[in-house]
């Protein structure tokens, strides 16, 4: 079933023209509209911009151009990453109107790698819990058992992946916030080495966690997806791309 294919597999399907990015985005959106009301993983929707990005990906491919390893792959991101024009709340009611003016650097790099970002996923208050409830968006449920938690703080990310509502995801981790929900939901998650991935655009306004604790990282449907995500966002990948 295409909903449960890895990001690398989805990118290959698009590259081989077995499915278009627009078709794949529409497919994931249809699954969000069908299943998200029960799971409550995706809490911010940015469909119109995503449709334009998917169309651009298809147009570039028709010219023989590939944008990157995630070319045309629809994905969502944790509600702690800035996505221009959308709210970054971090689950904190005080930030419910905090509209990002520009993308986080990691989001910018994911887009440069070809990803089509169509929404954001739920988190606990200030990303500080092993469940994913906040007063703004409510509780995210585990898609395997709606009476149970998907974990946290990247619970919305893991639940969206496990339910086949997105092709790839992002999270962040200090003491298990990627690894815990990945385990709870049966998907893959990786806490990268500190300093490998850029944290700019992943912090509360005027507040920074200790830089030697917080890292950002990928969640996916395969271990290969984790490598793809890390390389797409890392400084190493940027230097290689520029040379």
Give residue ranges: language-model regions:
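Short, well-ordered beta-strand elements within core beta-sheets of diverse protein domains
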Residues: 10-16, 95-99, 214-221
């Amino acid at each position: 079933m295409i909903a449960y294919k890895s990001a690398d597999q989805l990118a290959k399907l698009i590259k081989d023209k077995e499915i278009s990015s627009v078709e794949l985005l529409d497919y994931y959106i249809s699954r969000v509209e069908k299943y998200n009301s029960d799971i409550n993983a995706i809490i911010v929707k940015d469909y119109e911009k995503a449709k334009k990005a998917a169309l651009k990906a298809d147009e570039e491919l028709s010219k023989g151009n590939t944008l990157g390893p995630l070319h045309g792959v629809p994905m969502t991101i944790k509600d702690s990453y800035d996505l221009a024009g959308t709210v970054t709340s971090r689950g904190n009611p005080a930030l419910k109107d905090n509209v990002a003016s520009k993308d986080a650097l990691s989001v910018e790099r994911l887009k440069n790698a070809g990803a089509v970002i169509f929404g954001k996923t739920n988190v606990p208050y200030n990303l500080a819990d092993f469940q994913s409830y906040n007063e703004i968006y409510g509780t995210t449920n585990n898609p395997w058992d709606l009476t149970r938690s998907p974990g946290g703080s990247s619970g919305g990310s893991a639940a969206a992946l496990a339910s086949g509502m997105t092709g790839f995801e992002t999270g962040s981790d200090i003491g298990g916030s990627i690894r815990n929900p990945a385990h709870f939901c049966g998907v893959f998650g990786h806490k990268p080495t500190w300093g490998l991935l850029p944290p700019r655009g992943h912090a509360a306004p005027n507040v920074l966690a200790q830089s030697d604790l917080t890292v950002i990282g990928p969640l996916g449907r395969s271990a290969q997806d984790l490598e793809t995500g890390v390389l797409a966002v890392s400084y190493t990948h940027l230097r290689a791309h520029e040379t």
